[in-house]
């Protein structure tokens, strides 16, 4: 302010400090009535000052101020009280209760957008004054330019200067009108009467006036539809300030009472009501410290203000953002049309096809973000708005826009009408049921016609367009055909299939943000409002799906403005979909909190230069840089002060919480040693068996039944494949029937007693390699193979008990990725090698015939071959089916080698491409998953049908006995004598069997414990826990006992176990489009594994069908398992990099963080270990390959740590594999574990 406002001399000052030189000369003096004279002089002095203020315009050049002026200025600025309840409707004033003495004074935040509106406390006495003076208020009269109210106004507050800016919104004190300036001064009685009459004349003369801003608009009389009284109604735009002052003259009472009172009584009333009486404290005028954010409270009884009662807790929710733009429909009528939505990523509506595009990361222009920040800094921000309907919200938004001078008063109805237009969505035209109902907000056009037809003038600034209480419901009779019974609660409709599908992707308890942007020509400049509702409410037919709305953002403006409304709408939508920003929006108390959150968002944003991008490879660094920015953002978030109730505040609480977390992690670690014999086993039993009953109750789910069918084929196919190959390796001593029986019996026992029933136990490649090596060892030393297995089984039980007693399962932590990859790569190479070795052997036994030769001999050979083939097919116990030693297999059959090649290659390619088809783009996801999961059985079935259709070509079939009998009844029985079957078993071999038992135990230990580690990863969210010690004891002990019956040992099959766990995993349907699926729960139960084991055992009854499977088909499955096992092996990927230039290396950690030569050195060391293992496998010492394998563990711990740094080892030997649930092309269970099949 340039100068302090001039002090008007009140009657009180005239009483105590009279100034004789300023008295009117015509005033008579009566010594006997000195007190009355002084009061009269005070009144005259009061009028004189008003006239002087009107003539000088509020500021006198050269005016000097004394201490008395400053003292008066301080007193008046603190004690003057302006009656506010004149705006209150009569019924609301009657309902308002006085403030009790025990209650705290209530305050109401009423800051203007510039932060200048004070918060005023008001008592019941003010309402009485307002009711007494209500009769004098009437619509103002438009003053002439020569006598405008601004020329005669004066101010009593310290923040009101002589040169008042139009945007000031502080409450204005009364002003003197030009009519009062021309009043004659006569005697005391005549003067008082004239004063009262002229004040009445002023009020009546201004009844038909204009406010200068909205013609004919009543400014003071509250409308009947006014729902509540808000102190913010006192705020006016600058053009209305003078008129408001002219309407509030200092009239002590109404006209009828003034005529009955004497002059002294009127002066006393005026002095009491308008002057500063020393010793009497008026209600203080306090500034609002919160700034310009208006916490609007409308539509309720006057009660405790937001500062008096605790604010509703704003717990951040997941958000669903919808962008609506104001566009023209087919009939050229404006409507709000949905153009984009955000669940996590942006989805746009394609303009031509009106369908949703693919989810993508929103790319924003930097200018739109700056424009958004600028509009938020100067626009309307309403936090905790207490409204339940769209009309109520729109009404409050428009009111705030008018108050903050964003729009003119005459544009109020147009903006409100635009906000209440109909909302349309891309899914509306796809629904073939009844069309979408008109929303309550789409009645704006009807309301516009209603006001246009009425004779009333435009409503007051604070008058709602829709009168009545908030509980009023708007019901509209639609002209379209609807079912006769109308819902009682309003117009409703059933959810469409599109809505149900979209609702599944939106997280539970999510709250919506509605963004409304559009171009309107009736505005002269853009206007913005950001609204946060106190409680999330469902707005009828505003959103595409019925989600409660918490936030609204509105941006309207003319097309001439240099602003892209669509891009700004996308910017605020992307901000609201950002986790950090929408949490800040929930917890914001004022505008500055939102601006700070935008700045934090800009700090982590990436700006791309305006250059043309030729390929996606050029953008690889962008993703890396973005990850670094996000990591920095997370670190800064951890350093910030914790939010209330989210994290412990004190250091002591943090330390206590950390101790609890460490204790909980240690308690849940199943590999933690207790230091007591069998301590780990006891902990496993105590941890897992209390859930035993729930393991059966949780199986009552349709998903478990589907998993049984799927896992049955996943377990049967390897059993048949490995059984057929094992029969070939052991000369039918252990074949398909023994492997099927072992899988069934051990599976049933393990599912009933095991600690982790999600494990699927079965035969694997490493055990096949060991069985072949041990059979070769026994054959070369003339030892009985099955009897030697019995003694190995006894030693296995002893080793298992010793390992469990010493809690040795923790040793699995030392088996790193370095050893696992060598092991898996070795088994894959063996599978691939054995496949082609068998195929070459078939070509040797059945060579291709040339075109030359005797026709007779060829005919004879063909005749004998056909007779042999016919015997092979028709007789079930022939040489090719049963493998009896009395008969030889047919040799030299024509076309056998070629057909075997076709069957093997066909089986491999069908199974391999069906696996790829699972994650392709064809067909719905459910159909693709079913086809991909059953790829191996489908491949076997197709190739069996192909072989069955070719009748004149011989192929070797699978050897399966009839019924429950062993594969070779003439060679063995179901029970094996430990002392020897045909010859006594050497005693030295009984003791020496400990060495092969240790080797078998190493294989079973590694496979079982590593598989349990993979299944028990925290990413899988298992709740019932695992038991490493109990599972190892059961599997090894059952294998040792089964050796008495000539059954093979089993271990936890990695791929089948992971497949079983994935089949029982329930994924959350509330997954944002484009986001990775999240685990909701896992059906941890025992029934599926139990049923699968029983079904595998019952597969012996389909022996006739199994006997039709050619061995060449099993070779194709063998090749499939070898090739697919290479996926996910980092060692295999680094072998490719040896032949690749560095510029084509992938963007992975071990490439970026490790120098190329150091990475190749690590690969060479793994390759050297693999070559050593292969050399051992190729010699007579092949039985010792598990021992060589286990030596890679100390090699990695001792030797490699001296060659490579700790950082390099973390990059090259880190276990980064995570559970795979998404449908990425070429990614499945095999990518999750570097373990053999």
Curated annotation (Swiss-Prot):
- List of residues that carry Phosphoserine: 112, 131, 144, 170, 172, 239, 439
UniProt record, GO biological process: amelogenesis; chloride transport; negative regulation of CD8-positive, alpha-beta T cell differentiation; negative regulation of CD8-positive, alpha-beta T cell proliferation; osteoclast differentiation; positive regulation of enamel mineralization; regulation of actin cytoskeleton organization; regulation of bone resorption
Q: Which residues carry this modification: N6-methyllysine?
A: 270
Q: What main location does UniProt list?
A: membrane
Q: Where are the transmembrane segments?
A: 704-727, 733-770, 790-812, 822-843, 897-914, 930-950, 984-1006, 1032-1053, 1087-1132, 1159-1195
**Glycosites:** 855, 866, 878
Question: What ranges does the Extracellular topological domain annotation cover?
Answer: 844-896
Induction record: Up-regulated during osteoclast differentiation.
Leader peptide range in chain numbering: none
Region (Disordered) location: 1-238, 285-316, 445-466
Q: What membrane topology was assigned to this protein in its record? A: Multi-pass membrane protein
Q: What happens when the gene is disrupted?
A: Male mice are infertile and the size and weight of the testis is reduced by 40-60%. Spermiogenesis is interrupted after stage VII, with only a few late spermatids and a complete absence of spermatozoa in the seminiferous tubules. The number of apoptotic bodies is increased in the seminiferous tubules and in the epididymis, which also shows squamous metaplasia of the epididymal epithelium. CD8(+) T-cells exhibit increased intracellular pH and enhanced cell proliferation and activation after CD3 stimulation.
Q: Which PROSITE patterns match?
A: ANION_EXCHANGER_1 (PS00219), ANION_EXCHANGER_2 (PS00220)
Q: Where is this region: Membrane (anion exchange)?
A: 704-1237
- State the lipidation positions (S-palmitoyl cysteine): 1169
Tell me if DNA damage is a UniProt keyword of this record. no
Q: Where in the cell is it found?
A: Apical cell membrane; Basolateral cell membrane
Composition bias, Acidic residues: 119-132
Q: In which tissues is it expressed?
A: Expressed in the choroid plexus epithelium (at protein level). Expressed in the parotid gland and sublingual salivary gland acinar cells (at protein level).
Which sequence ranges are listed under topological domain Cytoplasmic?
A: 1-703, 915-929
Q: Which residues carry this modification: Phosphothreonine?
A: 253
Reaction(s) this enzyme catalyzes, per UniProt: hydrogencarbonate(in) + chloride(out) = hydrogencarbonate(out) + chloride(in)
Keywords recorded for this protein, A-Z? Anion exchange, Antiport, Cell membrane, Differentiation, Glycoprotein, Ion transport, Lipoprotein, Membrane, Methylation, Palmitate, Phosphoprotein, Spermatogenesis, Transmembrane, Transmembrane helix, Transport
Q: Give the family, as the similarity comment puts it.
A: Belongs to the anion exchanger (TC 2.A.31) family.
Functional description taken from the UniProt entry? Sodium-independent anion exchanger which mediates the electroneutral exchange of chloride for bicarbonate ions across the cell membrane. Plays an important role in osteoclast differentiation and function. Regulates bone resorption and calpain-dependent actin cytoskeleton organization in osteoclasts via anion exchange-dependent control of pH. Essential for intracellular pH regulation in CD8(+) T-cells upon CD3 stimulation, modulating CD8(+) T-cell responses.
Under what name is this protein listed?
A: Anion exchange protein 2
Q: Which gene encodes it?
A: Slc4a2
């Amino acid at each position: 302010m340039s100068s302090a406002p001039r002090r008007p001399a009140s009657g009180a000052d005239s009483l105590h400090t009279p100034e004789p030189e300023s008295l009117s000369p015509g005033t008579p003096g009566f010594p006997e009535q000195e007190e009355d004279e002084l009061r009269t002089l005070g009144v005259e002095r009061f009028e004189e000052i008003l006239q002087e203020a009107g003539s000088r315009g509020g500021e006198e050049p050269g005016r000097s101020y004394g201490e008395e002026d400053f003292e008066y200025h301080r007193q008046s600025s603190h004690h003057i009280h302006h009656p506010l309840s004149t705006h209150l409707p009569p019924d609301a004033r009657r309902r308002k209760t006085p403030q009790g003495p025990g209650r705290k004074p209530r305050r109401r935040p009423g800051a203007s957008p510039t932060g200048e509106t004070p918060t005023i406390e008001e008592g019941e006495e003010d309402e009485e004054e307002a009711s007494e003076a209500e009769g004098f208020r009437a619509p103002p009269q438009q003053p002439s330019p020569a006598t405008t109210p601004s020329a005669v106004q004066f101010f009593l507050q310290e923040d009101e200067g002589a040169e008042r800016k139009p945007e000031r919104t502080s409450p204005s004190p009364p002003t003197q009108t030009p009519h009062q300036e021309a009043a004659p001064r006569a005697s005391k009685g005549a003067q008082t009467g004239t004063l009262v009459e002229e004040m009445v004349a002023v009020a009546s003369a201004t009844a038909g006036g204009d406010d200068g801003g909205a013609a004919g608009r009543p400014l003071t009389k509250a409308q009947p539809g006014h729902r509540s009284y808000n102190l913010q109604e006192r705020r006016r735009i600058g053009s209305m300030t003078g008129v408001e002052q002219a309407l509030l003259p200092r009239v002590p009472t109404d006209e009828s009472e003034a005529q009955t009172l004497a002059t002294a009584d009127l002066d006393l009333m005026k002095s009491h009501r308008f002057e500063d009486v020393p010793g009497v404290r008026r209600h203080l005028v306090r500034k609002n410290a919160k700034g310009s954010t208006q916490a609007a409270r409308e539509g309720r009884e006057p009660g405790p203000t937001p500062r008096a009662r605790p604010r509703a807790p704003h717990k951040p929710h997941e958000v669903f953002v919808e962008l609506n733009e104001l566009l023209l429909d087919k009939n050229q009528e404006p409507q709000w049309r949905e153009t984009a939505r955000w669940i996590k990523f942006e989805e746009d509506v394609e303009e031509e096809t009106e369908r949703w595009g693919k989810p993508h990361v929103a790319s924003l222009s930097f200018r739109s973000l700056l424009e958004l920040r600028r509009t938020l800094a100067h626009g309307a921000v309403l936090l905790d708005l207490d409204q339940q309907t769209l009309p109520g919200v729109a009404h409050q938004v428009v009111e705030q826009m008018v108050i903050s001078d964003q729009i003119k008063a005459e544009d109020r109805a147009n903006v409100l009408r635009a906000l209440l237009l109909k909302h349309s969505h891309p899914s509306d035209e796809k629904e073939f049921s009844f069309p979408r109902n008109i929303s309550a907000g789409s009645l704006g056009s009807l309301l516009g016609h209603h006001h246009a037809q009425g004779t009333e003038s435009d409503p007051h600034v604070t008058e709602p367009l829709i009168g009545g209480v908030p509980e009023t419901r708007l019901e509209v009779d639609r002209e379209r055909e609807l079912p006769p019974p109308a819902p009682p609660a309003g117009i409703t409709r059933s959810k469409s299939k599109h809505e149900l599908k979209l609702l599944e992707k939106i997280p539970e308890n999510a709250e919506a943000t509605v963004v409304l942007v559009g171009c309107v020509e009736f505005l002269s400049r853009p206007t913005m409002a950001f609204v946060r509702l106190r409680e999330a409410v469902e707005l009828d037919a505003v959103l595409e799906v019925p989600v409660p709305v918490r936030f609204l953002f509105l941006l309207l403006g003319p097309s001439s403005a240099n602003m892209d409304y669509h891009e700004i709408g996308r910017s605020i939508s992307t901000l609201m979909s950002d986790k950090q920003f929408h949490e800040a929006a929930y917890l914001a108390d004022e505008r500055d909190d939102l601006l700070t959150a935008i700045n934090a968002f800009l700090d982590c944003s990436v700006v791309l230069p305006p250059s043309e991008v030729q390929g996606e490879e050029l953008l690889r660094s962008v993703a890396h840089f973005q990850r670094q920015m996000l990591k920095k953002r997370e670190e800064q978030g951890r350093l910030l002060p914790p939010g209330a109730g989210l994290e412990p505040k004190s250091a002591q609480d943090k330390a206590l919480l950390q101790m609890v977390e460490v204790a909980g992690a240690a308690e849940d670690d199943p590999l933690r040693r207790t230091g007591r014999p069998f301590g780990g086993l006891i902990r496993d039993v105590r941890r897992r068996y209390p859930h035993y009953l729930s393991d059966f109750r949780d199986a009552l789910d349709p998903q478990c039944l589907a998993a049984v069918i799927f896992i049955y084929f996943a377990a049967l196919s390897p059993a048949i494949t490995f059984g057929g190959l094992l029969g070939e390796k052991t000369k039918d001593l252990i074949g398909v029937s023994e492997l099927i029986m072992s899988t069934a019996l051990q599976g049933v026992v393990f599912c009933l007693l095991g600690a982790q029933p999600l494990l699927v136990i079965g035969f694997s490649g490493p055990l096949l390699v060991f069985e072949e090596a041990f059979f070769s060892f026994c054959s070369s030393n003339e030892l009985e193979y099955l009897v030697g297995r019995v003694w190995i089984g006894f030693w296995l039980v002893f080793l298992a008990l010793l390992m469990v007693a010493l809690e040795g399962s923790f040793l699995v932590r030392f088996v790193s990725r370095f050893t696992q990859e060598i092991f898996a790569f070795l088994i894959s190479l063996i599978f691939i090698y054995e496949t082609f070795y068998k195929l070459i052997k078939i070509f040797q036994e059945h060579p291709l015939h040339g075109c030359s030769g005797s026709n007779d001999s060829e005919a004879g050979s063909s005749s004998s071959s056909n007779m042999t083939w016919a015997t092979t097919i028709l007789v079930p116990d022939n040489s090719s089916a049963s493998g009896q030693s009395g008969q030889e297999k047919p040799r030299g059959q024509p076309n056998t080698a070629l057909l075997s090649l076709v069957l093997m290659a066909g089986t491999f390619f069908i199974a391999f491409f069906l696996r790829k088809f699972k994650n392709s783009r064809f067909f719905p996801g459910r159909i693709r998953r079913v086809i991909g999961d059953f790829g191996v059985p489908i491949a076997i079935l197709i190739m069996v049908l192909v072989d069955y259709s070719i009748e004149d070509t011989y192929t070797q079939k699978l050897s399966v006995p009839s019924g429950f009998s062993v594969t070779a009844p003439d060679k063995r029985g179901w029970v094996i004598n430990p002392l020897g079957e045909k010859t006594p078993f050497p005693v030295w071999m009984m003791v020496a069997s400990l060495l092969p038992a240790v080797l078998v135990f190493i294989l079973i230990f590694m496979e079982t414990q590593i598989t349990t580690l993979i299944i028990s990863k925290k990413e899988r969210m298992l709740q019932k826990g695992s038991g490493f010690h109990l599972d190892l004891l059961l599997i090894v002990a059952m294998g040792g006992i089964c050796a008495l019956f000539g059954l093979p040992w089993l271990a936890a099959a990695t791929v089948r176990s992971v497949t079983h766990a994935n089949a029982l995993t329930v994924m959350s349907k509330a997954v944002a489009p484009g986001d990775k699926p999240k685990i909701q729960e896992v059906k941890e139960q025992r029934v599926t594994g139990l049923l699968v084991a029983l079904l595998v055992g019952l597969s012996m009854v389909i022996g006739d069908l199994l006997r039709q499977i050619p061995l060449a088909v099993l070779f194709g499955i063998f090749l499939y398992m070898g090739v697919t096992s290479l996926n996910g092996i980092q060692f295999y990927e680094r072998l490719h990099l040896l032949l690749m230039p560095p510029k084509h290396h992938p963007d992975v950690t071990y490439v970026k963080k490790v120098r190329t030569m150091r990475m190749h050195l690590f690969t060479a060391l793994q390759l050297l270990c693999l070559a050593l293992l292969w050399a051992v496998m190729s010699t007579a010492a092949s039985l010792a390959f598990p021992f060589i394998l286990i030596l890679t563990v100390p090699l990695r711990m001792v030797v490699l740590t001296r060659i490579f740094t700790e950082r390099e080892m973390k990059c090259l030997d880190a276990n980064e594999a995570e559970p795979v649930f998404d449908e990425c092309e070429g990614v499945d269970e095999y990518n999750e574990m570097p373990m053999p099949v």
